Amino acid sequence: MGAMINIIYDTQNVSNEEADMLSHGIQKLVMDVMAVKDVFVYAQQPLVVLADPIEVFIQVNKAEVKDPAELTKRIASRLSAWKQENDFKPAININVHPVEWHYKIGI
């Protein structure tokens, strides 16, 4: 598995259209930065209390990421450029989490 992205957003400050745009944009961006195809996104709109408008949690395969800090910088840089290109205004926090996955598919 390449990466699993969870986007949590506050519907008071972020529209569903903006969340959809971000979901598709960040999926492609992470695929490009990591050079992997297996990247999927969940966008959620739970009750948000005293949190920033958009939190993005990116779980990556620990075995494939040698330097999480460098990966975070690369993703942040590309995301910043994407925001400008798409006139995307809401602030975004990103969190990169290397994980060791053990999974079975299609059970």
Give residue spans per PLM region:
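Short edge beta-strands and adjacent turn/loop segments
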Residues: 1-6, 33-60
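N-terminal presequence-like segments and adjacent domain-start helices
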Residues: 2-20
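Non-catalytic surface loops within mature trypsin-like serine protease
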Residues: 11, 60-62, 98
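Short, conserved charged micro-motifs
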Residues: 14-21, 65-71
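Generic non-transmembrane alpha-helical segments
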Residues: 21, 25-33, 74, 78-85
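A short amphipathic beta-strand at an alpha->beta junction
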Residues: 38-44, 84-102
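Mid-chain, well-packed structural core segment of small domains
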Residues: 51-86
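Short acidic DE-rich linear segments
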Residues: 103-107
